[in-house]
């Protein structure tokens, strides 16, 4: 069975973005994201794809979800729906969903794992991660709080579905 992991950095209010960008810069989170996703298919929505500074993400199979039938994402595969994107991952052990908010919302009921970077900030934004219902998710692992090289406190948390 395909393991489906949602990976995200979330502020205390579950904000993940503002104006199609992350409202903080935590180099250690980017390093974790890269290490975790290398060699795995990553699935994202069109807006997330368009926000990437480097496209496609190297060392990963990039799959972009867009309802626009003629949408072209150079260096990536496109899919019309989350279900179609997951079907492209049929031979993989794990698919990693990397956003944005709409895709996370669609994927949450299907997810087996959550890899959340808890960012100790409360920020204004326009994109939010879905609430993590503790009746469906148990905390499997948590790092101690750390302070990034940019001065922001954070922790990495791994949740498993009950």
From Swiss-Prot:
One of its GO terms (biological process) is one-carbon metabolic process. SUPFAM superfamilies: Dihydrofolate reductase-like. The keyword Cell membrane does not apply. The gene is folA. It comes from the Bacteria. InterPro entries: DHFR, DHFR-like_dom_sf, DHFR_CS, DHFR_dom. Key enzyme in folate metabolism. Catalyzes an essential reaction for de novo glycine and purine synthesis, and for DNA precursor synthesis. Belongs to the dihydrofolate reductase family. This is Dihydrofolate reductase. Its EC number is 1.5.1.3. It comes from Neisseria meningitidis serogroup A / serotype 4A (strain DSM 15465 / Z2491). NADP(+) binds at residues 8-9, 16-21, 45-48, 65-68, 98-103.
């Amino acid at each position: 069975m395909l393991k489906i992991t949602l990976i995200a950095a979330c502020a205390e209010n579950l904000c993940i973005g503002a104006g199609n960008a992350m409202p903080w810069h935590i180099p250690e989170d980017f390093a974790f994201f890269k290490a975790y996703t290398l060699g795995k298919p990553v699935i994202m929505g069109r807006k997330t794809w368009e926000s990437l500074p480097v496209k496609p993400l190297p060392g990963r199979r990039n799959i972009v979800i867009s309802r626009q039938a003629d949408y072209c994402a150079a260096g990536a595969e496109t899919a019309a729906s989350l279900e179609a994107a997951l079907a492209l991952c049929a031979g993989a052990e794990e698919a990693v969903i990397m956003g944005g908010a709409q895709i996370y919302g669609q994927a949450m009921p299907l997810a087996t794992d959550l890899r959340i970077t808890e960012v100790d900030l409360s920020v204004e934004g326009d994109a939010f991660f879905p609430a993590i219902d503790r009746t469906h998710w148990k905390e499997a692992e948590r790092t101690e709080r750390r302070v990034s090289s940019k001065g922001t406190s954070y922790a990495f948390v791994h949740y498993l579905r009950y």
